[in-house]
């Protein structure tokens, strides 16, 4: 493979996204009447367009339209039958006509059979030969008729004398019979009269009996009906009384039970009351005693307290007097001020008093109105309550009465419904029984009527058969007599040529069954009809096939042994359908059909033949024949397979062949035939010496056809070359192929020699190569075949034929037929079946019918009580309106009072000790009163039951009279037996027939490509030039003058006619074209007609026109024929040719044909398809492109079409992918490397050379930007190697996803196209997505993944321990390839940060491993990592172990985060960024920045990290709820640093500046 890369302008980012290429719109091309050829039509566009070629199922980018329907003219041309134009030839028949006329005058039945069609000859030589044959046949027919006529005249004279003698004797016998018959008739009349009188008397008695019986039955029925009616009334009343009494008793029992239960309940309640009263009394007496004791104690304590109080009161009163005087003085001054204040406030008070008065008046008015409202409201409510109480009382009474009425009605209804149900049940049973009786009567009647109808039909048939029987018997006996006479005559001639040496009648009529139906089963293989046709068109049978002759013995069966030749069931093949009009070696122009199987030695095919119309055995119809054909395992043919062509007409037999294209020495092929014949009753026919014809057993110098291993007995035909030797039937003594060779008497094929052509069914001496077998029993067999003569006898025993070698090879094949057409002469046939005397049928007995039973009367519906009327509620009175409360005036405030002076506090009076409260005296209990018991209910009085009715006894029925015994009619006299008249000589029937002979000009249509190669039923590419040649055979001598010679060709849909090229290819014709019907017409010019008519006595060669055009559809079949019309007579239709374009599944002519669909899939390095999956930047996509060529297998496109070339275009998105052209590989379907294909890469269409742009433009393809194009260096070699052989190619084109795609993320599309013969087809679009890898870095004070506090950009105190949180990029689920690298690289500032040697790694998302284990988000993953630290440079790299990464399922997402623990050791501002590496591609995180100010408590510089300064502990309080640390490990993994003295306490460190924490306080440790 050559690789070339071309540079040019890049495609615009504005005009192209990451979506894949789409196709250009192709201008539609007209399929008829268009002046411009398809390959000249191009479409250019500056924008991307889409594929429109989906109408055919093929993703075409140019000429996408589906083939339209065939025109009406084309369909009619290919299907409608028309009379064929012929020239009739008359042959003189004067002698034959005179012989027929003489025979008819003599009384011979002269039958003119249908004219025998000698066919339509095509050449003058054939015409002369056929005329000679007809003349000879007419002469023989005239001689045979004259011979029969003379014999018949002699037979008639002898017969008339014998008839006169017998008639006199029969007359005397007749007269005696008539006398006996008269006496018998008189006796019969006497007996009939006596019997009639007895019958009349009996019938009178029977009529009286029937009348008396009817009267008795009527009376009994009336009595029974009356009784049943009374009984029903009694039962209904009895049931009502019983149910009423039962209901009353049930109600009483319920009331008693309820009363008892109620009284039991009351008694129990009274007992409880008594218990509670006793308990209350005891409790009261206890409490009273306690009260009296407590009262005495309280009274004594209160007396002591009173004495103490009086002493303290005296001291208090003295001090009070002093204080009161001092306070009085101060009060006087205060009261003067108060008086002035009071005066001022008096005025205000007066005004306020008026306001109060007004308010009180308003209030009084309101309260009076309110009182009146309340009184009115109470009156209304009282009235409404009284109305409601009255309504409720009435409602209660109504409901009580309603319940009583409803219950009474329900009880009555239930009783009625029960009676109805019982009545319905009884009547249903009666109805069911009556229905059964009706059915039995109907069945009996139907059975009787059926039997009667059958009897009547049988009787009619019997009477007819009885009448026909003597006729049939006579016909049968006559035929048997005739056969016996014929056999006796044949016995005299049995040693003469053509006669059976053992004269026999042929009771098996089995000569011809053209309409038989064939079904096959086999343990071999069925063959497709298309495979058989394909085999005929090849190799040794091709020459005849091209002449429309199916030469079965030339077929090379190796062409039937391909795997795709096998069918699932039988398929018929022959000269029918598209082979109509073809000839076969089996029956010339007659239609022949056969099913084909492929067998090995010992394998069989079983054929069942039905729809037999012409076959009989002993005059009885044969309905079915079953043959089993088995390949004799002893056959010596060299190959392994045998083709059996089994004809649908069983009388034509089988063609068997193991011929592989070469003759074989010492070969043989034998087929065992096992067969059974069946009558119409499907029973096997038991043959009794039935004759089976064994014919056409040819023997040449090197080949012998024979029958062997047969059941039955061989019967030789005198003069035949066929005999029996060593159990084999064949030409035992001489050859029979050619007269004069090896003792052969005649030549088997027709030539000028007398007696030649014996090997045809209608040859008078066909017996020369035939014999017969007498068969008996139901199952018979015979093995038939052909063998090299050397297998039968030594060469020394063989006849010598000059110039021929008896050891020559031969074809191992044979056509043989086994039928009843015995070739011996004058073999009589059994055509009449021996009749059986008919048996008189027996009349059926008339049935006795059952009587139906009457139904019971329905019960009477009860009268229901009317329900009471419900009470009406009195409407409530409306309530009065409530008065509105008044709005009161507000009083004015008084002037504030003067401030009262501060008085001395009076002494506190002594406090009297309060008397203790006397205890509460207990209240005597109130005792409950016991409830009285309920009175017992009163038992009801019950109704008396009614008396049942008594039935009236039935009257006895009268005695039936006995039918008399009648006299028997005497036996009539026996019919006279007359002597049969001698059978008159049968009017012999002679048949004669005329012949039809015609000459017909032959037409043939051929379809060829531009290289003049026959492409009929093959495959050519779309846009190919296809030529139709309209050929006519030589015009025969003796024809009429040709005045017009017109060929009309309705072209197929989708075929683009080229008028100029057609005219150029058709000299001698005027060409016209009808665009509306897509039909082209050729008319011979005057000059051409002059050439045809130059000499009518000689044949003349014709010239032919050629239609030139292109096929423009994918997956289309172009069928075409033409009609020749000469002298405006009936047209002659040509054969139908057809060609198909690729892209059509289920194409019968081209089994490999299917849709043209290039495919594209994306795979990873392991060959897994990753279409639609997420791919990582830096990964390699292995695009696998299929160049779909299998549908072109056996294509026959012309050289100019092939030179359009073969290309494959890969339109890849260069924004996302980097082409690895050095790794591109092309292999064929077998895995072999493909050579002779170059690949070029162009950055855009404009950068490609004009040649490439033209190819793409004509194919309707416009890549979006960069593309690579594969092309065949030598189209012809590529076509021969891959296209014509149908071998698909596979292109693997690796492409690397560009690293920058991981920075931005996004999807990209990829599509390809193949261009074959200038036709473009688009592949599917492959879409993949690249995730954006966006690592993030935070600064945290905890190791809790749930803590989202980030102090990036804030202040960190000196000596604080904190963490860098490195959040890796997320790898989405369903990614294309395994992870093998996922690293965190942090280049920290070692001047400000000291790595403590501790880190942790956690899962950021749920991760699923290949073994199904799920690692939940937040799970620590440190154990799956390693760390590398360079403290000098301030760098740490945390790497996931590759084994762990590869254990992660590609269907799972993946993301991790690392915590690296640091200690701030310096003052200043520090920035930091980390790098996340994923599968070899690096991604930078954001930059974090933190600041550390001077420590006010310790301004010294930080010490070396190995000698840490005093640690700082920060205590903080959360604003609301306390922080809960996550459940992670409390220790970090050691990365090699030995100093781990400082470990941060998780979840308790905070900063003051950005966390809004309260109570921040630092202190020294």
Curated annotation (Swiss-Prot):
The gene is pac. The modification Pentaglycyl murein peptidoglycan amidated threonine is found at residue 1535. Residues 946-961 have a biased composition (Pro residues). It is found in: Secreted, Cell wall. It comes from the Bacteria. Pfam families: Adhesin_P1_N (PF18652), AgI_II_C2 (PF17998), Antigen_C (PF16364), GbpC (PF08363), Gram_pos_anchor (PF00746), Strep_SA_rep (PF06696). This is Major cell-surface adhesin PAc. A motif (LPXTG sorting signal) lies at residues 1532-1536. Ag I/II A repeats lie at residues 146-220, 221-302, 303-384, 385-466. It is a peptidoglycan-anchor.
């Amino acid at each position: 493979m050559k690789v070339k890369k071309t540079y040019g302008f890049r495609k615009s980012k504005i005009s192209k996204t990451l979506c894949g290429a789409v196709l250009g719109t192709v201008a539609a091309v007209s399929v008829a009447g268009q002046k411009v050829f398809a390959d000249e039509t191009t479409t250019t566009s500056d924008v991307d367009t889409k594929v429109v070629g989906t109408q055919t199922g093929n993703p075409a980018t140019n000429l996408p339209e589906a083939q339209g329907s065939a025109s009406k003219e084309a369909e009619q041309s290919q299907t409608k039958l028309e009379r064929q134009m012929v020239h009739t030839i008359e042959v003189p028949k004067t002698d034959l006509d005179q012989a027929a006329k003489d025979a008819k005058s003599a009384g011979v039945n002269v039958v003119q059979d249908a004219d025998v069609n000698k066919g339509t000859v095509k050449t003058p030589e054939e015409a002369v030969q056929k005329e000679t044959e007809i003349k000879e046949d007419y002469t023989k027919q005239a001689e045979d008729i004259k011979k029969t006529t003379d014999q018949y005249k002699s037979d008639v004279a002898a017969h008339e004398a014998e008839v006169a003698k017998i008639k006199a004797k029969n007359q005397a016998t007749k007269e005696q019979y008539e006398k006996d018959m008269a006496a018998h008739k008189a006796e019969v009349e006497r007996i009939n009269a006596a019997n009639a009188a007895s019958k009349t008397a009996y019938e009178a008695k029977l009529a009286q009996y029937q009348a008396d019986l009817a009267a008795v039955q009527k009376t009994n029925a009336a009595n029974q009906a009356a009784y049943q009616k009374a009984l029903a009334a009694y039962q209904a009343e009895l049931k009502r009384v019983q149910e009423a009494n039962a209901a009353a008793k049930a109600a009483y029992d319920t009331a008693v039970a309820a009363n008892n239960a109620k009284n039991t309940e009351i008694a129990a309640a009274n007992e409880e009351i008594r218990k509670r009263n006793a308990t209350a009394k005891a409790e009261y007496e206890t409490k009273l005693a306690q009260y009296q004791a407590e009262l005495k104690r309280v009274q004594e304590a209160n007396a002591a307290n009173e004495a103490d109080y009086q002493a303290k009161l005296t001291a208090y009163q003295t001090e009070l007097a002093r204080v009161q005087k001092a306070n009085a003085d101060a009060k006087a001054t205060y009261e003067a001020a108060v008086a002035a204040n009071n005066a001022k406030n008096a005025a205000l008070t007066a005004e306020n008093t008026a306001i109060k008065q007004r308010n009180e008046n308003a209030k009084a008015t309101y309260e009076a109105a309110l009182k009146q409202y309340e009184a009115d409201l109470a009156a209304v409510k009282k009235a409404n309550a009284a109305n409601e109480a009255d309504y409720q009382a009435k409602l209660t009474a109504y409901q009580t009465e309603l319940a009583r009425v409803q219950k009474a009605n329900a009880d009555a209804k239930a009783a009625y419904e029960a009676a109805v149900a019982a009545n319905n049940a009884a009547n249903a049973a009666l109805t069911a029984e009556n229905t059964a009786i009706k059915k039995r009567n109907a069945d009996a009647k139907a059975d009787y009527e059926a039997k009667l109808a059958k009897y009547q039909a049988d009787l009619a048939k019997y009477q007819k058969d009885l009448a026909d029987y003597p006729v049939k018997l006579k016909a049968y006996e006559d035929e048997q007599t005739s056969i016996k006479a014929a056999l006796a005559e044949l016995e005299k001639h049995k040693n003469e040529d053509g006669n059976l040496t053992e004269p026999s009648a042929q009771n098996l009529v089995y000569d011809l069954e053209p309409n038989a139906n064939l079904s096959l089963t086999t343990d071999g293989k069925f063959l497709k009809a298309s495979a058989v046709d394909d085999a005929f068109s090849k190799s040794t049978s091709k020459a005849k096939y091209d002449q429309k002759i199916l030469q079965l013995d030339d077929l090379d069966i190796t062409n039937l042994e391909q795997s795709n030749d096998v069918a699932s069931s039988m398929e018929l093949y022959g000269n029918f359908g598209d082979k109509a009009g073809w000839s076969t070696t089996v029956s010339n122009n007659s239609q022949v059909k056969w099913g084909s199987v492929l067998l090995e030695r010992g394998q069989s095919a079983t054929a069942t033949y039905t729809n037999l119309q012409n076959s009989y055995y002993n005059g009885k119809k044969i309905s079915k024949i079953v043959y089993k054909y088995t390949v004799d395992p002893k056959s010596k043919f060299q190959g392994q397979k045998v083709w059996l062509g089994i004809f649908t007409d069983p009388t034509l037999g089988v063609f068997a062949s193991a011929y592989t294209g070469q003759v074989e020495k010492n070969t043989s092929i034998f087929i065992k035939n096992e067969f059974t014949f069946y009558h119409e009753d499907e029973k096997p026919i038991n043959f009794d010496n039935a004759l089976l014809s064994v014919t056409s057993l040819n023997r040449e110098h090197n080949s012998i056809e024979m029958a062997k291993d047969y059941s039955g007995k061989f019967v030789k035909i005198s003069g035949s070359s066929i005999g029996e030797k060593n159990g084999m039937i064949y030409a035992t003594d001489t050859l029979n192929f050619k007269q004069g060779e090896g003792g052969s008497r005649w030549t088997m094929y027709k030539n000028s020699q007398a007696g030649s052509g014996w090997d045809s069914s209608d040859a008078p001496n066909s017996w020369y190569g035939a014999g017969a077998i007498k068969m008996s029993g139901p199952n018979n067999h015979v093995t038939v075949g052909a063998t090299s003569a050397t297998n039968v006898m030594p060469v020394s025993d063989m006849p010598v034929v000059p110039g021929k070698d008896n050891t020559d090879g031969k074809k191992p094949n044979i056509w043989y037929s086994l039928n009843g057409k015995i070739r011996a002469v004058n073999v009589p046939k059994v055509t009449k079946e021996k009749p059986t005397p008919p048996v008189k049928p027996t009349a059926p007995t008339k049935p006795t019918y059952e009587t139906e039973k009457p139904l019971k009367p329905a019960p009477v519906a009860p009268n229901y009580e009317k329900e009471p009327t419900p009470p009406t509620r009195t409407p409530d009175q409306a309530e009065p309106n409530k008065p509105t409360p008044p709005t009161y005036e507000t009083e004015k405030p008084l002037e504030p009072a003067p401030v009262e002076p501060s008085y001395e506090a009076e002494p506190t009076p002594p406090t009297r000790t309060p008397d203790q409260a006397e205890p509460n005296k207990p209240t005597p209990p109130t005792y409950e009163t016991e409830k009285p018991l309920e009175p017992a209910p009163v038992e009801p009085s019950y109704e008396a039951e009614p008396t049942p009715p008594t039935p009236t006894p039935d009257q006895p029925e009268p005695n039936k009279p006995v039918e008399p015994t009648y006299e028997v009619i005497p036996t009539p006299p026996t019919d006279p037996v007359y002597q049969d008249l001698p059978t008159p000589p049968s009017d012999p029937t002679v048949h004669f027939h005329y012949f039809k002979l015609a000459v017909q000009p032959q037409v043939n249509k051929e379809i060829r490509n531009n290289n003049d190669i026959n492409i009929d039923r093959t495959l050519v590419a779309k846009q190919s030039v296809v030529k139709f040649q309209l050929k006519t055979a030589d015009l025969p001598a003796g024809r009429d003058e040709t005045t017009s010679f017109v060929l009309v060709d309705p072209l197929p849909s989708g075929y683009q006619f080229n008028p100029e090229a057609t005219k150029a290819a058709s000299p001698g014709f005027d060409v016209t074209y009808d665009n509306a019907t897509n039909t082209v017409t050729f008319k011979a010019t005057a000059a051409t007609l002059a050439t045809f008519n130059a000499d009518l006595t000689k044949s003349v060669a014709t010239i032919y026109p050629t239609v030139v055009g292109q096929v423009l559809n994918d997956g289309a079949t172009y069928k075409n024929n033409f009609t020749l019309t000469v002298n405006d007579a009936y047209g002659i239709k040509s054969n139908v040719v057809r060609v198909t374009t690729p892209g059509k599944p289920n194409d019968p002519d081209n089994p490999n044909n299917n849709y043209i669909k290039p495919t594209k899939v994306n795979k990873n390095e392991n060959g897994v398809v990753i279409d639609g999956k997420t791919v990582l930047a830096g990964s390699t996509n292995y695009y696998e492109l299929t160049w779909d060529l299998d549908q072109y297998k056996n294509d026959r496109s012309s050289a100019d079409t092939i030179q359009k070339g073969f290309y494959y275009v890969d339109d890849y998105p260069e924004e996302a992918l980097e082409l690895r052209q050095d790794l591109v590989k092309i292999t064929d379907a077998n895995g072999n490397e493909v050579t002779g294909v170059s690949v070029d890469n162009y950055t855009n269409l404009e950068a490609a050379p004009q040649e490439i742009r033209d190819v793409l433009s004509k194919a309707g393809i416009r890549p979006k930007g960069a593309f690579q194009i594969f092309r065949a260096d030598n189209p012809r070699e590529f076509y021969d190697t891959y296209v014509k052989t149908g071998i698909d190619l596979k292109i693997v084109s690796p492409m690397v996803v560009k690293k920058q795609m991981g920075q931005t993320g996004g999807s990209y599309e990829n599509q390809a196209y193949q261009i074959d013969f200038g036709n473009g087809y688009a592949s599917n679009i492959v879409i993949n997505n690249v995730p954006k890898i966006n690592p993030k870095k935070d600064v945290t004070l905890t190791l809790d993944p749930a803590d989202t506090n980030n102090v990036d950009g804030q202040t960190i105190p000196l000596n604080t321990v904190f963490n860098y949180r490195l959040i890796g990029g997320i790898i989405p689920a369903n990614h294309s390839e395994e992870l093998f690298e996922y690293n965190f690289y942090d280049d920290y500032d070692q001047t400000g940060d000291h790595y403590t040697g501790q880190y942790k790694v956690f899962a950021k998302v749920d991760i699923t491993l290949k073994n199904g284990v799920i690692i939940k988000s937040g799970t620590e993953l440190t154990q799956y990592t390693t760390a590398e630290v360079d403290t000098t440079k301030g760098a740490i790299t945390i790497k996931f172990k590759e084994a762990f990464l590869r254990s992660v399922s590609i269907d799972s997402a993946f993301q991790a985060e690392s915590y690296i623990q640091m200690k701030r050791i310096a003052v200043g501002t520090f920035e930091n960024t980390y790098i996340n590496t994923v599968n070899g591609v690096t991604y930078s995180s954001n930059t974090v920045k933190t600041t550390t100010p001077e420590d006010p408590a310790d301004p010294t510089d930080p010490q070396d990290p190995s000698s840490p300064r005093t640690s700082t502990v920060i205590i903080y309080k959360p604003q609301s709820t306390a922080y809960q640390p996550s459940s992670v490990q409390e220790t970090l993994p050691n990365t090699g640093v030995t100093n781990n003295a400082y470990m941060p306490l998780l979840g308790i460190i905070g900063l003051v500046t950005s966390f809004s924490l309260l109570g921040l306080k630092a202190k020294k440790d």
